[in-house]
Amino acid sequence: MNNIKDLDFEELLNNPNFHYNLILKHEKIVKKFDEIITKYMIEDSECAEIIIGKYIYEKNQNRDEIYLPKSLTQNNKEEIIVKYIESENVNLRYLGMVINFPNKFKELNISDKIKLKAKGRYIQESNKIFKNSTGIETEVEVTYDKNQEEPVIYSVDKNICRVSVSRKWIEGNLDFNTLLNNFIYIFSFFDMQMRLSLVSNLSEIGSLERHVFLENSEHFYKISLAFRHKDIISKCQMYSYIEILEKHNIRIEEIIEWFFKYYLKDEFGIENFIVDMPTVNTSYLEKCKLIAIEIDKIIKQYQYYIQDGEIDEELLQISSNSIIFRNCMSIVNNKYVYPNSKVFDIASYLLFSAQSMMGYLPHIGIEYNEFYKLIIKEKVKLLDFENYQIGHIEWLIENKFIMEDKNGYLQFVNENKIYIFLDLYKNGVMSYWNCRKELRDEINILINENIVKFDNKLFTNDEQDYLNYHLNNSDFGNSLALRNRYVHGSQSNDDKLHKENYFIFLKIVIIIIVKINDDLCIKQIAEEKK
């Protein structure tokens, strides 16, 4: 490398087939030709994609580490990005990254003006692409049927997702307890383990969508098609439900205050929980400001109760710390179960992933997307599999997931273990105390084998991400950051938008209520089973 002259190196950079990644992955080359590389990068707007990608994508994503020249300043980087935004050939994905670029990197901070410029170009290019497109539209319809006996009916017809709720059920059960439970059992905000169903779930994202259409970076919340669909439905449910209740002179804010002031005291002996929801005549802008503060108060008070067994009003008044959801503790031990081993990763891939091709046996006319379905529904032997599959089968046998019966047919060794692995594969987490005893016993064995681990937080990891996406801007560049926006005064004058955001805030409060109630109920269950 010492023999390479500057002119020779510049000749390389001028080659039309040259790509910067060829040299930027070599730290020594970048260091030697630092200023030359900087000069050429400033003139090439496409280098913006390299610069942005360096910060957005992680080292563990099968990407080579990129080294930028030290002489490339913050201003240089912004200049290149502006040129990219103004250039003829722009990529919507990278424009999106600029718009949502997180302010957490010392080496690059994209200004709000540049982000706004990128947003304008993004809209312009999107309109060009989708102007004549024939995409599939999906509608959501939430209705309240006076004559319907079943509490809720979900159906899909010609790309219309319909949620039909029994108006008779709602109007016949107007006690506040049931009205809150409707978010669980009617609107399905939660599953039977009280895990939030509205989160962005990796198992709901197809391989093509994950690798082509979504930003594969921890700095962006994954807004998949499935997540958008659930989000739209939940918003429609919130709007319509609140409207129905108001016709019966019931405000959702009153139900929230009742939960903290009366329900917690009557059911769990928790006193002095202070929650003051916005009044009916308050503007939506002020409602958003007030409820953002109340959310912090709610979490702080519950954490004080966990720590001290009581809520200290004076401590609450002097506290100025912001709530960090990942630090919010549960009142019980062993609250959640998470995967924690290579054994889990390998077994789950072989058993449940369509990409493993383990359920594909075309020579005998059997095809299943997942191997575990093949074992459940068919009688197959080791000899029925292709050579490339047999090694994986032997691994599953060796690790006691499957076995051969006396006739040589493959079957599961322990169905409870398979159920746990499947649940964790699909949901990423299990609620230990909300599982039946046989599953808890099997989980205890897996804990001792270091295959899974316990966690003692109030919210699951996915729930923490969901809350942070909606409320804060610390974790995700594309977050709504509603709490930050209203607490710090950086909001618009759009009253319609404030109304939409207020309903999101209300949904967040309902989620927190269900999680707190579940936590306290689990404490009672755990104490009874000691």
Describe the role of every protein-language-model region.
Residues 44, 59, 187-190, 194, ...:
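Short, flexible helical or helix-coil boundary motifs
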Residues 216-381:
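Short, amphipathic alpha-helical interface elements at domain boundaries
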Residues 20, 40, 55-57, 67, ...:
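Sequence-level detector for tyrosine residue identity
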Residues 25, 41, 54, 61, ...:
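Residue-identity detector for glutamine
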Residues 1-284:
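Long amphipathic alpha-helical coiled-coil/heptad-repeat bundle
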Residues 22, 26, 41, 45, ...:
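Intrinsic-disorder-associated interaction segments
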